[in-house]
Swiss-Prot record:
One of its GO terms (biological process) is glycolytic process. GO terms for cellular component: cell surface; extracellular region; phosphopyruvate hydratase complex. Disulfide bonds: none annotated. The gene is eno. SMART domains: Enolase_C, Enolase_N. This is Enolase.
């Protein structure tokens, strides 16, 4: 039995470290009276929604304005004095105190990156004090569901310097019997795709999230390549491995029109384009198919495709329960992407996941394009029984770190482990 005094926060430290793009981010450490400690590093996005919590940067010339020394200062000089002496096991209280200390809705005073680093480090310190893995501490004895991975193997948009408008083209190995098998299937298609690209004289350089970033004629060419790679690797498209898209359409939405390819599309035309893709390819999930502010367009998209595929709100919902409730009230989308740094605390993240599940929406735990070796989201996916995780391709160690953590969790769970795809969970559209 652990002594309650062992859970008391003794000290909090922070440091400036680098993310996978070589940009600064913040790492926090929380030390408890009993000797346990927790550490967390915050990721950073490239294509960020306008309604995300505020990521604080230093400005100036150092690190081209992207330094986070002010964030470090806020953690050590303002947050630490307010939290030391409190119990690390009272996550809700810890997060609420930081939110009140900041005093703004989007956390612009202290910075969501400051608050989130401490929030996750606190949870990790408590889990370590109890001698529990993070997924068990945040979850419950029933938390044994391993997520279906959405593997970003072709990068475009803001994540790559190529001519693809859509940001991510993903493999979804839902037909596997275990997470380990799903990872193998994805890796085999990834390497098959690399050879196909090489044989065609196309680049096999990778983008921010570890996927290939070739210059292809259009989005359809990416779909064709993926289907070909799946088949050549020995799998059945649509039965064992399907496709998912992150359109990231806010990035090319200007003056009420969607600018991509050689055209300019209204919301109605954009919906028609997405319907064509769903009919052409084994697509079961579309993320941010329309812009974050195009609510009427989203209503149409959901009406047309909501019963066929998973429609995911990322920039649309930004892991925010207020925006998610608005979407639910208007019957918009049927899934939410969960990014911890979009909202800035672990408590609010868990609230968004809980709301989505209670209202019949699926949830996908997601990385950011600027990632680190921190594997919290792998544990979070299992803890919340989310059923899906999006953490990049099968290359770059900051992406693979999450997959490897899920392999460890699957081993720890043993016979209890259940792969979401094997029991018909995961993205909508698997039965189409």
């Amino acid at each position: 039995m652990i002594d309650s005094l062992d859970l008391v926060i003794d000290s909090i430290f922070a440091r400036e470290v680098l993310d996978s793009r070589g940009n600064p981010t913040v790492e926090a450490e929380v030390l408890l009276e009993g000797g346990a400690k927790g550490r967390a590093i915050v990721p950073s996005g490239a294509s960020t929604g306008a309604y995300e919590a505020h990521e604080l940067r230093d400005g100036g010339t150092r690190y081209m304005g992207k330094g986070v020394l002010r964030v470090v200062e806020h953690i050590e000089d303002r947050i630490a004095p307010s939290l030391c002496g409190l119990s690390a096991s009272d996550q809700v209280n810890v997060d609420q105190i930081m939110r009140e200390l900041d005093g703004t809705e989007n956390k612009e005073n202290l910075g969501a990156n400051a608050i989130l680093a401490v929030s996750i480090a606190t949870a990790r310190s408590a889990a370590n004090a109890f001698g529990m893995p993070l997924y068990r501490y945040l979850g419950n004895p029933m938390s044994s569901l391993l997520p279906v991975p959405l593997m970003n193997v072709i990068n475009g948009g803001a994540h790559a310097a190529n001519n693809l408008d859509f940001q991510e083209f993903m493999l979804v190995p839902h037909g596997a019997e275990s997470f380990r098998e799903a990872l193998r299937m994805g890796a085999e298609v990834f390497h098959t795709l690399k050879k196909l690209l090489s044989d065609k004289g196309l680049s096999t350089a990778v983008g921010d999230e570890g996927g290939f970033a070739p210059d292809l004629e259009n989005n359809n060419a990416a779909g064709d390549l993926l289907v070909q790679a799946i088949e050549k690797a020995g799998f059945r498209p649509g039965e064992e491995i399907s496709l998912a898209l992150d359109v990231a359409s806010t990035e090319f939405f200007k003056n009420g029109l969607y600018h991509f390819g050689e055209g300019k599309f209204s919301s109605e035309k954009m919906v028609e384009e997405l319907k064509k893709l769903v009919n052409l390819y084994p697509i079961i999930s579309i993320e941010d198919g329309l812009s974050e502010d195009d609510w009427s367009g989203w209503e149409l998209l959901t009406k047309e495709l909501g019963n066929k595929v998973q429609l995911v709100g990322d920039d649309l919902f930004v892991t925010n329960t207020k925006r998610l409730r608005q979407g639910i009230d208007r019957s918009i989308a049927n899934s939410i992407l969960i990014k911890v740094n979009q909202i800035g605390t672990l408590t609010e993240t868990l609230e968004a996941i809980d709301l989505s599940h209670r209202m019949g929406y699926t949830s996908i735990i997601s990385h950011r394009s600027g990632e680190t070796e921190d594997t919290t989201i792998a544990d979070l996916a299992v803890a919340t029984r989310a059923g899906q995780i999006k953490t990049g391709s099968l290359s770059r160690s900051e992406r693979v770190a999450k997959y490897n953590q899920l392999l460890r969790i699957e081993d720890q769970l043993g016979a209890q482990a259940v792969y979401a795809g094997s029991v018909g969970l995961g993205p909508r559209g698997l039965s189409k």
